[in-house]
Amino acid sequence: MLDPKFLRTELEATAERLATRGFILDVERLSKLEEKRKSLQMATEELQASRNAISKSIGQAKAKGEDVAPIMAQVGDLGSQLDTKKQELAELLETLNAIAMSVPNLPDESVPAGADESENVEVRRWGTPKEFNFEVKDHVELGETLGGLDFKAAVKITGTRFIIMKGQIARMNRALAQFMLDLHTTEHGYTEAYVPLLVNEESLLGTGQLPKFGEDLFHTKPATEEGQGLSLIPTAEVPLTNIARDTIIDEADLPVKLTAHTPCFRSEAGSYGRDTRGLIRQHQFDKVELVQLVKPEDSMAALDSLTGHAETVLQKLELPYRTVVLCTGDMGFGSSKTFDIEVWLPAQNTYREISSCSNMQDFQARRMQARYKAKSAKKPALLHTLNGSGLAVGRTLVAVIENYQNEDGSITVPEVLRPYMGGLEKIG
């Protein structure tokens, strides 16, 4: 969430910056609520001071042998008024907090202005798409012919947007995840973590999935008097980042760099009719996630390095890709700046997103109270958090199958994956 003090003191400027990402902040309503908050705060403090002053006079009256009943009645009346004002203030603060939780992050000044994905800006390309001398097939046809992708069985068992992988295709899927983890932990300095696949509401609030995107989640257990509800993770970003919730990290221990390979679960509530064929958009998919916790002054450089770590996976797999910076109107809710990496898919004759790398600055940290303490500082300060896919395993599998296909329908195994597949050079 945004800094409440900044919202109060820079309301008009905040509204202007939010408008660039298509979010209309109700300035008039917020101004009125803020005036009411000030009024209630002042009234509460005045009533508290009056009650304290009169309460002190009770002892003095008793010492003089005076009747304290009128004073006691006055104190009681002030107490009732104070309780009423406190309740009004608490309800108002709850309203203000709910509004603050619904406001997206401010775009960084370096983010290009734009309304939607058509105004994203390409920043670089790597590799040249292969020219095939035969008609290319998509991953669905190739995978089904090889007996490695079974969509029909998945539909029978669960429903649409699920997959059963078998044989060497399943092995390649596993090999990709292992390769990514080994790369990030041995060459990029990340610590591997094994995390829960179920998280509570406080964790989802911390990383920004709640309250706005509840319909995108798979909820497994509703909230009760005994505890919070539980939901399946949409990304390992949620448990990895929440490790820092309500903690103070020593400056000497920064940056914190974590990675995890997990299944991810998304309802794809707003994606009806999109990418209905194949593995591109599934309810359950594997992903290797990258998370960094850094000092504020280091976060933009960290975004560049994190994006580079994700790109390295594609470079080692020799898959052509391009990197774009998202414009203000296409960024995610909690992001201040995002780079999307798009891999070349021959069957679609286009680049498709395979990773999204974002700097959240202190947006998540404020929600989670994730802080660090510098030696020279008197008080802890909020961390900056970053996250990105390194990579989405299923989409990487799609890219490998399509880019490494042969005319006879077989798939050449990329050299970097062969050690993970017992030296296998070809599937089929």
From Swiss-Prot:
Pathway membership: Aminoacyl-tRNA biosynthesis; selenocysteinyl-tRNA(Sec) biosynthesis; L-seryl-tRNA(Sec) from L-serine and tRNA(Sec): step 1/1
Major localisation: cytoplasm
Origin superkingdom: Bacteria
Binding of L-serine, residues: T235, A236, E237, E289, S389
PANTHER family: SERINE--TRNA LIGASE, SERYL-TRNA SYNTHETASE
NCBIfam families: serS
Record's protein name: Serine--tRNA ligase
